[in-house]
């Protein structure tokens, strides 16, 4: 079979959650599995992370998918509800809602629910995306407190905009704003994402929201090394993306390789054609020199990424054969490196794996 393969190590996934809980023993872990479990498979990840205290998803469709397969854990929908029909489903399926705008508050006031709703008040401390301003939040909190449709206490949360930056000025300001505005509010608090989890121990409050680190990937990329050793030592990559060599060719000096003739052989040399391309989710903008792993050694990508194939330089691997597995990222080759080469972030690469990639689960 010549399809690219994403191997998902569920043992590594469980291990990473256990490490997170060990590093923050006083906090509950709210596992972020939005965007199809960061590309790893929504249901697969949820079933593997049964020890999580709750799951975070982006939209109601993701939450309902989990309920349909029997996931009974608390689920919080980060974008909340947008109409009465959705709100009724939240109550029916016991879904938690993030409340971030006045329209949602109005819906709560005018809708008769079959059961009360668990909600989290989103306070915008500087992300300037979703949430009530610091000035608005006390009044909204008091308004929600009077609603018979809402379970008490009300959850209180914010989102950090710049926690992966070595300059801590803005994030410290956000945390200060959050603690100040919630000082007189009663309810569980949640502040940190994956980067905040490592960089701001003072913000490890009632609930933490680990995302990318669950999958064994640094939220800091490769440029912020303060936590590099801890992450490499304690966390394991969950996804390994691989594909097979489908052809080996001996090319002459000055022969060009791939579309646009952007790369030419500096000497007579062997090259391999690997069965993966941007149609599988490998980044088209990955430049020549982007590393792949073949038989435990690094080989560089050469030429443009095609829809279905890439070419690699085999001068360091003269004994390579058709059928050999090539690792594009994962175990032995961090996806953060590929993201850096391609001018993007690991999150995007993981979320863009396409349906034609074969997914295999292992326990290792």
Swiss-Prot record:
Entry-linked InterPro entries: Ala_racemase, Ala_racemase/Decarboxylase_C, Ala_racemase_C, Ala_racemase_N, PLP-binding_barrel
Keyword Isomerase: yes
Pathway it works in: Amino-acid biosynthesis; D-alanine biosynthesis; D-alanine from L-alanine: step 1/1
Record-listed E.C. numbers: 5.1.1.1
Record-level GO cellular component terms: cytosol
Keywords: Isomerase, Pyridoxal phosphate
GO terms of molecular function: alanine racemase activity; pyridoxal phosphate binding
Keyword S-adenosyl-L-methionine (UniProt): no
Residues found modified as N6-(pyridoxal phosphate)lysine: 34
Active site: 34 (proton acceptor), 259 (proton acceptor)
Recorded catalytic activity of this chain's protein: L-alanine = D-alanine
Pfam families, alphabetized: Ala_racemase_C, Ala_racemase_N
Residues the record lists as binding substrate: 129, 307
Cofactor: pyridoxal 5'-phosphate
GO biological process, one term: D-alanine biosynthetic process
The family this protein is said to belong to: Belongs to the alanine racemase family.
Function noted in UniProt: Catalyzes the interconversion of L-alanine and D-alanine. May also act on other amino acids.
Protein's UniProt name: Alanine racemase
Provenance organism: Coxiella burnetii (strain CbuK_Q154)
Lineage, broadest ranks: Bacteria, Pseudomonadati, Pseudomonadota, Gammaproteobacteria, Legionellales
Gene: alr
């Amino acid at each position: 079979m010549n399809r690219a393969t994403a191997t998902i190590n569920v043992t590594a996934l469980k291990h990473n959650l256990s490490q997170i809980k060990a590093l923050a023993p006083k906090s509950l872990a709210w596992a972020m599995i939005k965007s199809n479990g960061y590309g790893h498979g929504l249901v697969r990840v949820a079933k593997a992370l049964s020890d999580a205290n709750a799951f975070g998803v982006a939209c109601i469709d993701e939450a309902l998918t989990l309920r349909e397969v029997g996931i009974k854990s608390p689920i919080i929908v980060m974008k909340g509800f947008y109409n009465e029909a959705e709100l009724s489903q939240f109550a029916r399926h016991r879904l938690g809602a993030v409340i971030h705008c006045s329209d949602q508050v109005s819906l709560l006031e005018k809708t008769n629910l079959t059961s009360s709703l668990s909600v989290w008040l989103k306070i915008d401390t500087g992300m300037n995306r979703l949430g009530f301003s610091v000035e608005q939040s006390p009044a909204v909190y008091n308004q929600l407190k009077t609603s018979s449709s809402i379970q008490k206490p009300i959850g209180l949360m914010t989102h950090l905009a710049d926690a992966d930056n070595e300059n801590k000025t803005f994030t410290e300001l956000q945390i200060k704003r959050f603690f100040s505005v919630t000082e007189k509010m009663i309810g569980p608090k949640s502040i940190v994402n994956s980067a905040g989890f490592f960089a701001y121990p003072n913000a490890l409050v009632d609930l933490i929201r680990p995302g990318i680190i669950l999958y064994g990937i640094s939220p800091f990329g490769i440029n912020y090394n303060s936590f590099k050793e801890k992450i490499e030592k304690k966390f394991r990559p969950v996804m390994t993306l691989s594909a097979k060599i489908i052809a080996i060719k001996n090319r002459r000096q000055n022969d060009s390789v791939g579309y646009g003739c952007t790369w030419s052989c500096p000497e007579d040399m062997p090259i391999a054609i690997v069965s993966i391309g941007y149609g599988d989710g490998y980044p088209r903008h990955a430049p020549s020199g982007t590393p792949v792993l073949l038989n435990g050694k690094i080989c560089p990508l050469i030429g443009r990424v095609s829809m279905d194939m890439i070419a690699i330089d085999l001068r360091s691997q003269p004994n390579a054969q058709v059928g050999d597995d090539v690792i594009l990222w994962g175990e032995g080759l961090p996806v953060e490196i590929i993201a850096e080469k391609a001018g993007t972030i690991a999150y995007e690469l993981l979320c863009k794996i396409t349906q034609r990639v074969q997914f295999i689960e292992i326990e290792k």
